Amino acid sequence: MTPMRKTNPLMKLINHSLIDLPTPSNISAWWNFGSLLGACLIIQTITGLFLAMHYSPDATTAFSSIAHITRDVNYGWMIRHLHANGASMLFICLFLHIGRGLYYGSFTHLETWNIGIILLFMTMMTAFMGYVLPWGQMSFWGATVITNLLSAVPYIGTDLVQWVWGGYSVNSPTLTRFFTLHFMLPFIITALTTLHLLFLHETGSNNPLGIPSHSDKITFHPYYTIKDILGLLLFLLALMTLTLLSPDLLSDPDNYTLANPLSTPPHIKPEWYFLFAYAILRSVPNKLGGVMALMLSILILTTIPALHTSKQQSMTFRPLSQFLYWLLITDLLVLTWIGGQPVSYPFITIGQVASVLYFTTILLLMPTSSLIENYMLKWT
């Protein structure tokens, strides 16, 4: 008799996605981050829902409602810190997931890759809005500085900023709309994640060798379900260690001070996962130019499939490209460090050099190195 999972319309969907899914037999631990991102999304949604039950999106009560959650709600401190550190863990998994896609050439699956970039944008938007909600000093000034960038848009810039703010400054209307969007966006992200998976299962997963693996595939369950559970346990160990032993390690002390429009913090900066883009923004002296560089630092990912000049999909057997790949990763780490430093010499110069190197590596050096490798292997 045919198992129910193969006949029931609902179970058939789950079966084709998680149980009988044909999967390459040689995918490594770098392929674990997709499932970890799914776990992150579930954790963030659940903790976020519990926080929303006690949160008050108003400039006069937001800060005290966070204090109330932390002090008076049962396990409120834990839910709050799980949510804040869960965002950091989500971005770590997200960056590693994108890094794996770049290294092993997963960007050749165009629909999956482009939906992934949209997901990255939406996750960044959601995280930024979430950072504003505690209504501390860094929340307020971060919101003021980042939303002010819209004023760089020609003709409609000023009107656009006031429209986003809901007034002439960041205040209660801004907080209310940010809370609404922060609540709504994760559900759109969940829908897009389903699309991301749908397109991935149309083409099948890539593998470390970057070669077709149709002749050697195994079922997802039990092999990769066990592997994903191990990854999930290690992920939960890291998240709980961070949350229980050092919950404020990745947050800013300024956010424990109530937002004050009359007092500017000495150094305004976003959360650590935005620092690389913030450094690129600051390295351009012109406001509009900076905003464009900021957008391009993420949008450049859409050009990667077009810039792929190698005859090989993966970087596994391409030492020159590997060197440039790790140069790019190092450059991003330097940009992250610079984004957290004050705007003074020598940090300005280092940031500008690192920003130029970031774009040059992706747009020029990597495609050129691929052509050199093709020539050396006589694959021209």
UniProtKB/Swiss-Prot annotation:
InterPro entries linked: Cyt_b/b6_C (IPR005798), Cyt_b/b6_C_sf (IPR036150), Cyt_b/b6_N (IPR005797), Cytb/b6-like_sf (IPR027387), Cytochrome_b (IPR030689), Cytochrome_b_C_euk/bac (IPR048260), Cytochrome_b_N_euk/bac (IPR048259), Di-haem_cyt_TM (IPR016174)
Chief location bin: mitochondrion
Residues spanning the membrane: 33-53, 77-98, 113-133, 178-198, 226-246, 288-308, 320-340, 347-367
Topological relation to the membrane, as annotated: Multi-pass membrane protein
One GO CC annotation: mitochondrial inner membrane
Residues that coordinate or bind a ubiquinone: 201
Pfam families: Cytochrom_B_C (PF00032), Cytochrome_B (PF00033)
Residues annotated to bind heme b b566: 97, 196
Requisite cofactors: heme b
Residues engaged in binding heme b b562: 83, 182
Keyword Membrane (UniProt): yes
A GO MF label: ubiquinol-cytochrome-c reductase activity
UniProtKB keywords: Electron transport, Heme, Iron, Membrane, Metal-binding, Mitochondrion, Mitochondrion inner membrane, Respiratory chain, Transmembrane, Transmembrane helix, Transport, Ubiquinone
Localisation: Mitochondrion inner membrane
Presence of keyword Transmembrane: yes
PROSITE patterns, A to Z: CYTB_CTER, CYTB_NTER
GO-annotated biological processes: mitochondrial electron transport, ubiquinol to cytochrome c
Cofactor note: Binds 2 heme b groups non-covalently.
UniProt record similarity statement: Belongs to the cytochrome b family.
Function recorded in the entry: Component of the ubiquinol-cytochrome c reductase complex (complex III or cytochrome b-c1 complex) that is part of the mitochondrial respiratory chain. The b-c1 complex mediates electron transfer from ubiquinol to cytochrome c. Contributes to the generation of a proton gradient across the mitochondrial membrane that is then used for ATP synthesis.
Subunit structure of this chain's protein: The cytochrome bc1 complex contains 11 subunits: 3 respiratory subunits (MT-CYB, CYC1 and UQCRFS1), 2 core proteins (UQCRC1 and UQCRC2) and 6 low-molecular weight proteins (UQCRH/QCR6, UQCRB/QCR7, UQCRQ/QCR8, UQCR10/QCR9, UQCR11/QCR10 and a cleavage product of UQCRFS1). This cytochrome bc1 complex then forms a dimer.
Miscellaneous note of the record: Heme 1 (or BL or b562) is low-potential and absorbs at about 562 nm, and heme 2 (or BH or b566) is high-potential and absorbs at about 566 nm.
Protein's name in the database: Cytochrome b
